[in-house]
Amino acid sequence: MGSIKRVWCISLFLYLILLVGTSIADFVPGSYLTLPQCIAATEASAVYPNDPGWQDAKVGERIRIQRRPVVVTYPINTTQVQWLVQCANSFKRMPDPRNGGHSNIGSSSMDNSVVIDISYMDSVVIDAATQTAVVGGGIRLGPLYIELDKAGFTIISANHPTVGLSGAIASGGFGLQSRKYGVTGDLALEAEVVTADGSVLIANAITNPDLFWALRGGGGGKYGIVTQWKLQLIPIWAKFTVFNIIYFYTGFEEVLTNFWNWAYGSLDDISVSLIFTNNEINIQGHFLGGEKDLHGIVDPTGLFKVGNAKAVKHNDCTHLGSRAYFIDKDKTCDKIYLLNVGTSPFGPNYGDVPTLQTADVTPVTEGVIEGYGAALKQQRENVKTKSMFFAKELSVENITTITELAKTMAYGAHAELTTYGGILETQLTDLTAFPHRNGVAYHLLLEVPLTGNATIDEPALNYINTWEETLRPLSNGGSYVGYEDEDLTNPGLSYFGGNLETLKQIDSKYDPNNVFNAGQSLNQTTPSLTTDKCPFIAGGDPPGRRSTGVKINENSLVYITQILLTIVLLINL
């Protein structure tokens, strides 16, 4: 009988050891000696400076400012995001979230940071009955439009297919038919968020509503990393017309005057922009109606007849075809493959010094959706950008000033005057953190390409600065946070207006140690990484490091107590 008891007790002892080993095998970044060891334990893919592909991994689409993070990671689930944030915290590195990689100032791949690129978190689950979708936080807009279209739905957001959904929502998300439905953030119902300490929170109108408010238009790289969104969907429009009017700079002042006086006050069903380069002007639009109705709206403005206007109209596009229309230089509705940009849509980055990029004709291969072709990899952009909002009032003299600036457009420069108003005019500026609603008539985006050669680039920079100095006083002072500009005197005020102080309070609540500090949006400074105290850990000190990746929790203490009792029992047998 004694031997049976001993066998039973030994078996129980081994079983309890197994339980303890399982229960204390939680991820503990402080148990690893180096950052690479910690990141390897997360099982997320990672690229380091000496690895093949580093030059491509370390930057997104915009390469004017080349940053040097310590590593770029690619999680595929929320747990990995949590662990990566904890690794960065433990080793005094800033966790820097990246979605689409479109930051104008490189804020999604900051120096010495751990970049957490969520672009592989791109799942889409649609509930047709409720017209909602649960979407991975890293998906890009082109693939999202395709997946939603399969079920007969869409959302409101930007035309550019490589833009990330989370980045769009963090910027507000103005896009096609925002005058009818609002911005992308207005369609968000809920977010799953990894916060600064690696915890996961749900944010919606009831749970953590202040965080939910901030995530929609409060700027990227702040508050937390959204790993999943729940979106309200919109049924695909039954009838619509897309159009493009080209003027070749004939009668530009008349075009600008007529456009300015008409577009803002037009029907909510029409989305329209005035675009000008150094060799032509065009008006691009999307109308929720037929061609006859479109003429009834636009003909009284004379915009179809100014100078040598050439109009191209389509009323037979599919929904995806109309999306592709706006990025197709030939203005057709046939190139749906342009939207199918996958998860790695950019061509090569040529080094630490931004250079003039050349086109890449290699098709995208990673993450493309079967049956839709594949977009070509897009060249990365070395551009300088300015953004400003205008109220309705603009004098004849102001129109003339803009006309004269447009006539001297720098080679390759691009300006886009986009119409706001519509439903946005009826919304309070604090509906979400995105404030550019009531009182905003137009948004002006100006971009000039750069080469990386200071001598060659000087005229282009002088030109864009002239626009800034001349037109900023005519604007309402606001700028779109999606087009970050390091030259702004008070970026937080320009991006968020009266919402800035509330955003600071929310940021302090959910990120008291300023862990997510990549962008300039809240006028904050980056904490030192060389201090004796760790600024990323509450209380200042990083977790103690142990040789094994285990953590003793309350359950573990219970199991250990049971083991000790078993040992006592064994001794007394």
Model-identified regions with their sequence ranges:
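Active-site or pore-adjacent capping/gating segments
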Residues: 565
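A periodicity- and composition-biased signal for non-globular, repetitive helical segments
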Residues: 11-12, 568
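C-terminal membrane-anchoring or membrane-association module
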Residues: 569-573
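Soluble FAD-dependent oxygen oxidases
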Residues: 2-9, 18-546, 551, 557-562
